[in-house]
């Protein structure tokens, strides 16, 4: 169950209501998650099983040259595969044996695509047999374009990896040096952010027993009934459900550590659940904000419009409002209101403290109507997908690609300056 979980109805008498539109939605395909996940799991190899279109996307959109030899590849489905003329198992076995000989990974991750869904390819059935034959773990994740947003590809992969985590046993507690319960943090972030967030929690006497994903597959954290889990990204609701229902972890429902305010709230919530008093956290946040004054003076009083692309929009809106901006609308492809309840609560409190109205929250936004609303409010900054950036720039609105925020360091106290540096670039350009 969610520890101290706040439901939407409990947030406030005037709790934020989300509107839902049904417009055509434009985003990257979730198979793009391999671009950052293969860097996080250093001994992995990702095999995307799809069509030529998937291969073109990975090669062109992600900007990776063939000679760079990244640790992911395409298993291209041909006419014979789709018409069942070829044996899927034999073809995948041939590829996995070649990967084993050439790259020596500790784990192979099969990424299913739209085509494998449509032709009902039994990846989950083939993987156990093949991994027993070649002696390498094979994790199956269906990160296809049927999801709402491309970041949900990571959610699918982490949910699959959560099933492979070892079981937590009580005797493991004997090795812990602190009195805090075992805690697993889930979400893919750079190694520097892992170190920073782990250090911040250690300063509050909270010991992190593991991260999902881990840098090495063999180091996946142990999970079970006595283990608490907490996420760092708002698009990981499927992973949270897997950890709660399948692995019986206790989920800590918290805001996400994006921006100094979010990082402080994230740490405070974990400490509150563990019955610990925080020390020096408010002063730590104040120091960070004071160091950002040059950027804050640039954004203060400016307005923003988030069209919606990567499910980070609620957290980003809260951070921008805390920086002194006015956010007119938050478009978001999909929102798990239960998983983001604490973040919504923090957004409301931030708006109340800043004496600004709550932004309009629209799920599955219709881009045509969004552009009309944007024309009415004339925002200074639009955080948008790549498809709309140039037209909006031509109309005089500064834009920032939301996909850049996905690859940027957003989490923790130390990343606040980098985040503002990225967001303020279009404002400095037009200033």
Curated annotation (Swiss-Prot):
Question: What is the name listed in the Swiss-Prot or TrEMBL entry for this protein?
Answer: Light-independent protochlorophyllide reductase subunit N
This chain's source organism reads Nephroselmis olivacea
Family (UniProt): Belongs to the BchN/ChlN family.
Q: What does this protein do?
A: Component of the dark-operative protochlorophyllide reductase (DPOR) that uses Mg-ATP and reduced ferredoxin to reduce ring D of protochlorophyllide (Pchlide) to form chlorophyllide a (Chlide). This reaction is light-independent. The NB-protein (ChlN-ChlB) is the catalytic component of the complex.
* Pfam hit, one: Oxidored_nitro
**Which PANTHER family does its entry note?**
LIGHT-INDEPENDENT PROTOCHLOROPHYLLIDE REDUCTASE SUBUNIT N
Question: Which InterPro entries does UniProt cross-reference here?
Answer: LIPOR_BchN/ChlN, Nase/OxRdtase_comp1, Protochl_reductN
Keywords associated with the record? 4Fe-4S, ATP-binding, Chlorophyll biosynthesis, Chloroplast, Iron, Iron-sulfur, Metal-binding, Nucleotide-binding, Oxidoreductase, Photosynthesis, Plastid
């Amino acid at each position: 169950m969610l520890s101290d979980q706040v439901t939407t109805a409990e947030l406030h008498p005037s709790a934020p209501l989300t509107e839902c539109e049904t417009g055509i939605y434009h985003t990257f395909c979730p198979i793009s998650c391999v671009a950052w996940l293969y860097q996080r799991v250093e001994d992995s190899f990702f095999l995307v099983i799809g069509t030529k279109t998937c291969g073109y996307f990975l090669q062109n959109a992600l900007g990776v040259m063939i000679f760079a030899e990244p640790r992911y590849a395409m298993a291209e489905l041909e006419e014979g595969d789709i018409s069942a003329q070829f044996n899927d198992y034999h073809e995948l076995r041939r590829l996995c044996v070649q990967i084993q000989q050439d790259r020596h990974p500790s784990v192979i991750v099969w990424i299913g695509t739209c085509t494998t869904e449509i032709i009902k390819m039994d990846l989950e059935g083939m993987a156990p047999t093949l991994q027993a034959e070649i002696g390498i773990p094979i994790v199956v994740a269906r990160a296809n374009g049927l999801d709402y947003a491309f970041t949900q590809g990571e959610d699918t992969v982490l949910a699959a990896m959560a099933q492979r985590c070892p079981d937590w046993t009580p005797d493991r507690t004997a090795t812990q040096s602190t009195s805090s319960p075992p805690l697993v943090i889930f979400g893919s972030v750079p190694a520097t952010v892992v170190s920073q967030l782990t250090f911040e929690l250690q300063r509050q006497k909270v010991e992190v027993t593991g991260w999902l994903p881990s840098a090495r597959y063999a180091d996946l954290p142990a999970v079970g009934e006595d283990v608490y889990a907490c996420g760092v990204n708002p698009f990981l609701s499927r992973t949270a459900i897997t950890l709660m229902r399948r692995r019986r972890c206790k989920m800590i429902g918290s805001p996400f550590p994006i921006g100094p305010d979010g990082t402080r709230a994230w740490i405070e919530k974990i400490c509150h659940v563990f019955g610990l008093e925080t020390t020096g956290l408010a002063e730590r946040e104040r120091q960070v904000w004071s160091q950002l004054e040059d950027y804050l003076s640039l954004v203060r009083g400016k307005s923003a419009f988030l069209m919606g692309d990567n499910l980070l929009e609620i957290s980003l809106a809260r951070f921008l409002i805390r920086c002194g901006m006015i956010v007119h609308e938050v478009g978001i492809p999909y929102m798990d209101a239960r998983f983001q309840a604490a973040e919504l609560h923090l957004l409301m409190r931030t708006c109340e403290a800043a004496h600004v109205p709550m932004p309009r929250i629209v799920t599955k936004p219709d881009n045509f109507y969004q552009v009309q609303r944007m024309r009415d409010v004339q925002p200074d900054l639009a955080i948008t997908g790549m498809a709309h950036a140039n037209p909006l720039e031509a109309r005089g609105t500064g834009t920032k690609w939301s996909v850049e925020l996905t690859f940027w360091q957003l989490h923790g106290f130390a990343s606040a300056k980098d985040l503002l540096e990225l967001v303020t670039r279009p404002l400095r350009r037009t200033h």
